[in-house]
Structures are given as structure tokens and as C-alpha cells.
UniProtKB/Swiss-Prot annotation:
Protein name: RAP domain-containing protein, chloroplastic
Compartments, as annotated in UniProt: Plastid, Chloroplast
Organism: Oryza sativa subsp. japonica (Rice)
Lineage of the organism: Eukaryota, Viridiplantae, Streptophyta, Embryophyta, Tracheophyta
Record GO cellular component, one term: ribonucleoprotein granule
Observed effect of gene inactivation: Leaf albino phenotype, reduced root length, and partial seedling lethality.
Alphabetical list of Pfam families matching this protein: RAP (PF08373)
Bias kind Acidic residues: ranges: 147-158
Transit peptide (residue range): 1-32
Length: 640
């Protein structure tokens, strides 16, 4: 009889659902006792206690266990001695059941319930008072949580969550559950660390009185430091001293910008590996220094904003400092009228190297660059044009100003500057700058600068402008013997000039400006060498390429079209397929970068039907079947 009661009842005759109900056998009256009392043998309702398993326990056990027990009513006053659902063949449910019994034996069920069960909504009668209570709750410090009152804990967590969301914050389910571990220990620790971090940052107020001698001494020590670690150690020492009561702080906005600039410069001096830079950037002291820089950014000079932007691009590359670059863009727009040509070029170059799109900032920098057109040095002009082209932002005001300068001058002359005979290197000190003179404009470019400008005009589609014509003519001064496939600088120059020349042939044949003779032959020969055409196939490309074979067509992979390598093509149909990974798009907005837009435009102009697949689209697909159907749809194979 007892064994029969513990087994789940059979299924209902007409599709009914089996409900497992656990009985408390100890309360059943025995047959002898019933006979002695002279009463008939039957199961009286008070003699059997039947209750459903709480919903939070079913949630913990999983969906498999949920079908084996009655969901019942949610009971706030939990009986932890209730029997669990009937045995199941699912080993996961059995393992969770054993863990649940162990947790109950240790008296930790309330903590587990707070982790598993979602916070309950508290019904409030008056809406007018609800808003005031939440605002007051957010302003006042939270009292310690009472672990003895589970319901109060749930209501308090609900208030905290609502206050956070009302303040513009977001909290996902995972963060909410982690915050409730160990009676909120991790949440409290996070809040303490956050308050300590804010308190440390507030100690460095730009409006505080200054100590000139300490500031100058610290600045000298930062400049004289030979390694990035030495610079960071100096700033960490000052931060610790300020936390202990040093006032005023010698770590002014100028010294903060100088420290970041010297850290990046020392990294560049030793060619530090990217992995080491990223590890350095994630250290506690470095995070504190970057946080101080963001706080002091509005008080920095235009040169300080430029130095911080350049430093972050060298330290974090395109992997870190996304919100920091957004803040730099906001502050730089307010200070752009005070920027000089160097500041304009450095800020644009740093955003381009980090693949961080900022259209409003680039637009403001372009207007400022057009005003400063006569003060640009050759390197600054090449860097700014390259930055705009890399982000696919055309600087129309600056291009118009350059064309106007060329037309207004009686003689416009561009020269090729070679610092060391027989070696092609960039010059650190330029011999001249673009000056506002009524007689002539003399530009003394290096080979790499001409390559950057030529590539920028090709990417922007502005090769029919007078300024580009004057720059392009200087290529006739090159000596072909100085181009080799053994140097990275040579390969970069060849790739830029070769693509610009091919664009002139294909998109601007009416200009009749393409290179001819030995120079074109040497560029083409170097561009087709094995060292120049080294290919790297990502796992994303391999995954998509494998599914391409399932479309029923024979694809030619890694096909070359006039210097461009296309991932896969159908030659007979003139169909080109490009697989664009994250490096083809800006990291924050997901817009195509300049080199991607130029490649698409060039392949389409060459007569190919180009179809592109971005990694964002691919990540939204689930399963190979859906991926294959998507490929067939974008390639136009649905009708087959």
C-alpha cells in the first residue's frame, strides 16, 4: 500500500496528464488502529497531506521535471521537507534533485530561492507616491539587507532594479542573478569598488588649487621616464598619495595627457607586441589613469585632447576604449575651433586607426582643416586625407580649398623628397609646408605621403580634381630600381599606387593620367609577386566557403580581379561573392570602411555582379539549413 502511494498515478484514459503527487506516508492510519477504534477502513482527507512542489524548485530542476509535477500555486511560506517530483530518466534532473536535497539539508534553501526565483512585483496603491519613493530610494544610501526576511529582500531588489532602470541603466538576467549570490555579497562589493573609484576620481578636481613646483617636477619625471612601466609607476604613486590626503594633486590635465602620450610613445619605441599592450591597458593603474583622463578631458587643451586620442589608439588599437573614444569625439567637437593643423591630423588619424566612426567629428574637423589649409605640413595633410578615406568620410570643404589654392597660385609645384639616397623612408622633419604666398605653393612630399594621398583620392572617388593631378605628376620622378618587394614600406606604396592607377584606367579613362612605360611595368611586376599576394583565410571564410559548395555550383575561390582578390566567383556568370569580416566595418556603427567601399565599387565597375555577406548578417542566422537558404537567396539561386 505504501509503495503504491509513492508511485505516480497512471495516465488518464482519454489523453489526461499524469500528475505526480507526493503523500506523507507517516500520517496514514494503520489498519490495526482503525479496527481497534471500530471504524471502517478508509482514507480520511485529514489523514493524507498532499502539496505541490514549489515553482522555484521546478525552475531549478528544469523543464523535464516541470512536466512531472504539479505547478500548483506559488506558496510564499515554503515547506522545505516536501517531497520532490517522481524519478525521471533524465540524468540532468536527477543531478539537480540530488543537489537540491543537499542544499536543503544545509539550510541554504532561502538563498537558492532568491537566485532562482525572479523578483516579485510589489503592488502599490498610490502611483503618485511610487515615483517619489523611488527617487528618494535612489538618493539615499541603502541599509544593510536583512537575511531573515525573504519577502522584504525580494521587494528591496525590485526597488533597486526599478531605480536603476529609471536612471538609464540596464541590468540583464545574468547580472541580476550574480548580484544575488551569497546574500548580495558580490553586489555590495561591486558597489563599494564603484564608490571608491568615483571617490578617487573626484579627488582630482581641475578647479582645485595647484602646486606649481610639484606639477613641473612630475612633468619632468614623466618626460624623462624611459619605459611605459616607469611612467605608469609615477602616476600610480601620485594617485595613491592623493588617496591618502595629498592636496593639491600634481596630476593636472596637462600631466595626465603627457603621461598617456609618453606611455604610447615608449611602446612605439620598442615595438611592443599587441598582446603586451592589451595586458598593460587592462591593469588597474592604467585603467585609473584612463579614467582620470576622461574626467579631465574638458579641461585639457586642444593639444592635450590630441595627445590622449593618439595615445589610446596606440595602446588599445581597435580592440579597446570604445566609450572613451566616443567621449573624446564629444569633447573634441567643442574645442575644434582651437585646433591647429597637427591636432586635426592626429585626431582624425587616431579614429581611423581604431576603426571608430565619428561622422560629426570628422565633419567638424574637415571644416577646420579647410580654414587651416595654408598651415598644413605635408605629413599632416597626408595623414588627415588618409584618415578621412579610411573611415569613408569625404572631406569636401578641404578638397575644395586645396583645388582653390592650386588654381589661384601662379605656379603650383610638388617635389619628391628623398632623405637618404637609395633608400625610401619617411622624413621626420619636412623641408617646407604649404604656405599662403602670392608667388607659388611648394610642396616637398615623401614617397609614402604621395602613396597615401593617391590612395585616399581613389577611395573617395575624387581623382578628377586639380590638386590630385599635381600630386600624381610627381610620380614621374621615381626611379624604378628603388622599388623592392623586400621592404614593407615598398609593398605598401606599391599597393596604394597600383590600385590608384587601376582606378584611373577603369573609372577615369577620359583623364588619360594612368602611368605608362617602365614605371607601370615595375609596379605591376611587384604587385603580382608572391610576397605581395599573401592570402589569409579566416575561419569565417572557411565556414561560408564550405556551405557555398552545397549551392550546387562550382566556385573558383581566391580569384584575382585586377589586383583585388575575391573570395569566390562564378566566372561564366560574372558573379563575385565577398565574405566581409569585422575588419571591413567600423567597430561602433558597423558602416563599411573606405577600403571595403572602394573594393566593391571597383569590382562592380569591372563588370562583375558583386554580392557581399557581412559577419553581422551571418551571426543572426541559426543552423546550417537557415544559413544555406540565406546564401541561396542573396545569390539569386531560389528559382533553380
Amino acid at each position: 500500500m505504501e509503495a503504491a502511494l509513492l508511485r505516480p498515478p497512471p495516465l488518464a484514459a482519454r489523453g489526461g496528464v499524469s500528475i505526480a503527487i507526493a503523500f506523507s506516508v507517516s500520517r496514514l492510519p494503520s489498519a490495526a488502529a482503525a479496527a481497534a477504534a471500530g471504524k471502517p477502513r478508509k482514507l480520511a482527507p485529514p489523514a493524507c497531506r498532499c502539496r505541490a512542489t514549489p515553482q522555484w524548485q521546478l525552475d531549478f530542476l528544469g523543464a523535464e521535471a516541470d512536466t512531472e509535477a504539479d505547478g500548483g500555486d506559488d506558496d510564499d511560506d515554503l515547506d522545505l521537507d516536501l517531497s520532490l517530483p517522481a524519478e525521471t530518466n533524465d540524468w540532468c534532473v536527477r543531478a539537480r534533485r540530488s543537489a537540491l536535497r543537499s542544499i536543503e539539508a544545509r539550510g541554504l534553501s532561502p538563498s537558492l530561492q532568491r537566485m532562482v526565483a525572479s523578483p516579485k512585483k510589489k503592488n502599490k496603491k498610490k502611483k503618485s507616491k511610487k515615483t517619489n519613493l523611488k527617487q528618494k530610494k535612489a538618493a539615499e544610501p541603502k541599509p544593510p539587507r536583512d537575511t531573515d526576511d525573504d519577502e522584504d529582500d525580494e521587494e528591496e531588489a525590485d526597488d533597486d532594479l526599478e531605480a536603476l532602470l529609471a536612471g538609464g541603466g540596464e541590468l540583464d538576467d545574468l547580472e541580476l542573478r550574480v548580484a544575488q549570490f551569497a546574500d548580495g555579497m558580490f553586489d555590495e562589493k561591486r558597489q563599494r569598488n564603484r564608490e571608491q573609484f568615483i571617490q578617487t576620481l573626484s579627488a582630482f578636481s581641475p578647479a582645485a588649487p595647484s602646486n606649481r613646483s610639484q606639477e613641473v617636477s612630475l612633468n619632468r619625471s614623466i618626460v624623462e621616464a624611459r619605459t611605459a612601466d616607469e611612467v605608469l609607476a609615477l602616476t600610480a604613486e601620485v594617485v595613491a598619495a592623493v588617496a591618502k590626503g595629498l592636496s593639491p594633486s600634481p596630476l593636472t590635465p596637462l600631466n595626465i595627457a603627457t603621461a598617456l602620450h609618453r606611455i604610447a610613445k615608449n611602446m612605439e619605441a620598442v615595438s611592443m607586441l599587441q598582446t603586451h599592450r592589451l595586458g598593460f591597458a587592462r591593469s588597474r593603474d592604467m585603467s585609473m589613469l584612463v579614467g582620470l583622463a576622461m574626467v579631465a578631458l574638458p579641461e585639457c587643451s586642444p593639444q592635450g585632447v590630441s595627445n590622449i586620442s593618439w595615445a589610446l589608439s596606440k595602446i588599445g588599437g581597435d580592440l579597446l576604449y570604445l566609450p572613451e573614444m566616443d567621449r573624446i569625439a564629444q569633447v573634441a567637437i567643442t574645442k575644434v575651433d582651437s585646433f591647429n593643423a597637427q591636432n586635426v591630423a592626429n585626431v582624425a588619424g587616431s579614429f581611423a586607426s581604431m576603426r571608430h566612426s565619428a561622422p560629426d567629428l570628422i565633419s567638424a574637423l574637415t571644416r577646420r582643416a579647410a580654414e587651416l589649409v595654408y598651415t598644413f605640413k605635408e605629413q599632416e595633410l597626408a595623414q588627415f586625407l588618409w584618415g578621412c578615406a579610411s573611415l569613408n568620410e569625404c572631406p569636401y570643404p578641404l578638397l575644395d580649398a586645396l583645388d582653390t589654392a592650386c588654381r589661384d597660385a601662379p605656379s603650383f609645384d610638388c617635389h619628391l623628397h628623398d632623405t637618404v639616397p637609395g633608400m625610401w623612408q619617411s622624413s621626420d622633419k619636412e623641408a617646407s609646408s604649404l604656405k599662403n604666398s602670392s608667388n607659388a605653393y611648394a610642396l616637398n612630399f615623401t614617397r609614402d605621403q604621395i602613396g597615401n594621398i593617391a590612395w585616399s583620392y581613389a577611395v573617395l572617388g575624387q581623382m578628377d580634381r586639380p590638386f590630385f593631378s599635381g600630386i600624381w605628376k610627381t610620380l614621374s620622378q621615381f626611379e624604378e630600381r628603388k622599388i623592392s618587394d623586400q621592404y614593407r614600406e615598398d609593398m605598401m606604396f606599391v599597393s596604394q599606387v597600383y590600385l590608384a592607377n587601376q582606378s584611373l584606367k577603369l573609372e577615369y579613362p577620359h583623364l588619360d593620367m594612368c602611368l605608362r612605360g617602365d614605371l607601370e611595368e615595375n609596379l605591376t611586376k611587384t604587385g603580382r609577386s608572391k610576397r605581395f599576394n599573401q592570402k589569409m583565410t579566416s575561419s569565417f571564410q572557411k565556414e561560408v566557403g564550405r556551405l557555398l559548395c552545397s549551392t550546387g555550383h562550382e566556385w573558383n575561390k581566391e580569384y584575382t580581379i585586377d589586383g583585388y582578390t575575391v573570395d569566390a566567383v562564378l566566372v561564366d556568370e560574372k558573379l563575385a561573392f565577398e565574405i566581409d569580416g569585422p575588419s571591413h566595418f567600423s567597430r561602433n556603427l558597423g558602416t563599411p570602411l573606405g577600403h571595403t567601399a572602394f573594393k566593391r565599387r571597383y569590382i562592380a565597375a569591372a563588370g562583375w555582379n558583386l554580392v557581399s555577406l557581412s559577419h553581422q548578417e551571418w551571426e543572426n542566422l541559426e543552423g546550417e539549413f537557415e544559413q544555406l537558404e540565406y546564401l541561396r537567396r542573396i545569390l539569386g539561386f531560389d528559382a533553380e
